[in-house]
């Protein structure tokens, strides 16, 4: 049966409305708003993911062909900056450590890093909600004071190039029985640093991408606001170049409402593989976030997206409307070749980019 003109008209109208709604939802900050607030662009450099590190994220067997050169560079640059020595037997510059950030500065790379808050309200730089992967300690950052963190070495018994720390004694008990030592361990080690100390080390030498981390990106509570306020206060007193980003649209919106002059970015990815949640409600929210339909909340200046999704309709549309696409996390020359024309900036680890 042929379609009636009335049905076709309604279908076309519905499609136009849906397309218009998608464009409205995904649209970044307007050019006039950028001009009015003198918003800087995302500096055009390579960004070292969690610093230039010799242990931690991305250093898996999958990338072993190129990661050796990367680890060697991280150690060389860290030692040049005064961290460790050729005689240091273990890890010198673990991810998100002062040594890793100093190494990135020495190599001339920008830095991507992560902010969380300790039990006593200190803003620290660490990615995961707990210390298991980076210190073999299952305790959560939110349950530890900064003083305790200074006595917990990152990758304490691991060799350079390790992607995960070996579990501490009693870490795998149920419940875990790990406790913080009364005194700092002897010898060289790195621990979770204060954000204030990271800013002192970087001292404006390279630009920063600062990510605000939260346990649940679909919620917003007073402790989350406290992290925003304290992190921003440190950045307001900092004279170097930086931009901010978060998976949580409410965090990016906080900057929209309170610091419109700061370049802000929405982090996202298309849920897939092992990282995909089994909760159908949460998964629906993740798919919506991956489609960038919450960008109307934050109106970002850039979209930091999993590099696999650079050719997706939502990223291409955001780029067309003026958002700067930033890839994460590129871990080989082959991955860079696959996504280089889809993104304008790149966050990398586990290989040394040819373009420096």
Language model segments and positions:
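Phosphate-group recognition and catalysis centered on beta-loop-alpha active-site segments
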Residues: 2-356
């Amino acid at each position: 049966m042929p379609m009636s003109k009335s049905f076709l008209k309604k279908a076309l109208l519905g499609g136009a409305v849906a397309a218009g709604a998608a464009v409205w939802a995904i649209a970044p900050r307007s050019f006039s708003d950028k001009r009015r607030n003198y918003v800087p662009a995302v500096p055009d450099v390579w960004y070292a993911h969690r610093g230039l590190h010799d242990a931690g994220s991305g250093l898996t067997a999958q990338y072993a062909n190129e990661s050796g050169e990367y680890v060697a560079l991280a150690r060389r640059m860290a030692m040049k900056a005064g961290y460790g020595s050729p005689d240091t037997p273990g890890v010198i510059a673990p991810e998100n450590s002062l040594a890793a950030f100093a190494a990135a500065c020495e190599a001339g790379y920008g830095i991507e890093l992560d902010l969380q808050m300790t039990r006593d309200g200190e803003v620290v730089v660490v990615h995961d909600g707990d210390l298991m992967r980076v210190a073999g300690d299952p305790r959560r950052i939110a349950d530890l004071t900064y003083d305790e963190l200074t006595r917990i070495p990152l990758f304490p018994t691991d060799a350079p190039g390790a992607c995960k720390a070996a579990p501490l004694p009693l870490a795998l008990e149920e419940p875990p029985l790990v406790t913080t030592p009364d005194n700092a361990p002897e010898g060289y080690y790195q621990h979770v640093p204060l954000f204030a100390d990271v800013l002192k080390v970087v001292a404006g030498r390279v630009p920063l991408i600062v990510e605000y981390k939260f346990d649940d990106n679909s919620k917003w509570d007073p402790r989350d606001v406290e992290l925003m306020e304290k992190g921003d206060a440190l950045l307001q007193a900092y004279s170097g170049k930086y931009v901010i980003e978060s998976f949580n649209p409410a965090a990016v919106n906080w900057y929209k409402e309170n610091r419109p002059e700061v370049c802000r970015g929405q982090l996202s990815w298309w849920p897939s593989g092992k990282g995909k949640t089994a909760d159908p409600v949460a998964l629906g929210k993740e798919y919506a976030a991956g489609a960038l339909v919450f960008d109307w909340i934050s109106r970002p200046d850039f979209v930091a997206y999993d590099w696999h999704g650079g050719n997706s309709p939502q990223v291409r549309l955001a780029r067309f409307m003026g958002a700067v696409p930033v890839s994460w996390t590129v871990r080989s020359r082959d991955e860079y070749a696959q996504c280089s024309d889809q993104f304008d900036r790149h966050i990398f680890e586990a290989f040394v980019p040819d373009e420096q």
